[in-house]
Amino acid sequence: MSSFLSGLYNEARNAAGGVKDFATGIVSPSLRIGVTGLSRSGKTVFITSVVHALLHGGKLPLFTALTQGRINRVYLEPQPDDDVPRFAYEKHVESLTGDARHWPESTNRLSQLRLTIEYEATGLVARNLQGSKLHVDIIDYPGEWLLDLPLMSQTYAEWSAATLKASEREPRKTLAKQWLAHIGTLDPAAPADEAQAQKAAKLFTDYLASCRADDVSLSTLPPGRFLMPGDLAGSPLLTFAPLALDPATKSADGSLHAMMERRYDAYVSRVVEPFFYNHFARLDRQIVLVDTLSALNAGAEAVKDLKTALTDVLGC
């Protein structure tokens, strides 16, 4: 299926799902809130602390309904999406409050938690149409996935050019030396070579990991799954890398260029687009946590890169 037809199909499916959600929401309203942020930004602790405060009557001065005394009851319920892992709320509470206290593990996959709030509605219309119960579905996912969304509007050639151009500036330039040296030995028009593709992908992944290190703290590091591969580790979907391409030259069948381009396109269509249409596009609200202190500590280039990452995401 072409990307155009695939996009039309996904848009139609989302529209149908939206009608269904609207019809269901009249009887039992729900609010889907996405929570994300780059690694070590505090997503897990944030979600756990907010849910704990709601369940146990903690102080949330900006939650107007709570400060007005209109919240009658808050409790957890089974989540609506059976194919999504549950956010391990109880495990994280134990990590933070148990005898052997430690920080919870970082987010490395998408998870969900449903919180139901029974409240006293204000106004006759609101009370009759919406009742006094709201389901809040919290969707937790790695911020690295969010940074992949701009890839939906970039071709392989455009992404390669942008990535290589970014590597010309410090601190990326120093960190990219080994990867760029290998890229310089590759002929995009040469026959496809799996060993060369694997080596290029490995060196590119090492470069991205170095850019994310605490002393550098760069943020614009797509593709996100290269740093959080999960069950995709070692698959062709993650075995590609940018190439130095002639803008006027198209990929020839059977070439290294064609192999890399095909795998990039597959990554976008099989990883990025499903996340966008199945999860991101269905969110009603989005919370993005930003670790500005790490960027400030790493220097001006890290702050500039963080701004670029946020600008790219907000443009999606």
Place the predicted regions along the sequence by residue.
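N-terminal pre-Walker A segment at the start of P-loop NTPase domains
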Residues: 1-28
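Switch- and interface-adjacent substructures of P-loop NTPase systems
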Residues: 19-20, 53-316
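Nucleotide donor/acceptor-binding cores
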Residues: 31
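Hydrophobic anchor at the beta1->P-loop junction of P-loop NTPases
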Residues: 35
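P-loop (Walker A) phosphate-binding loop of NTP-binding proteins
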Residues: 38
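Conserved glycine(s) of the Walker
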Residues: 41-43
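Post-Walker A alpha-helix
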Residues: 46-47
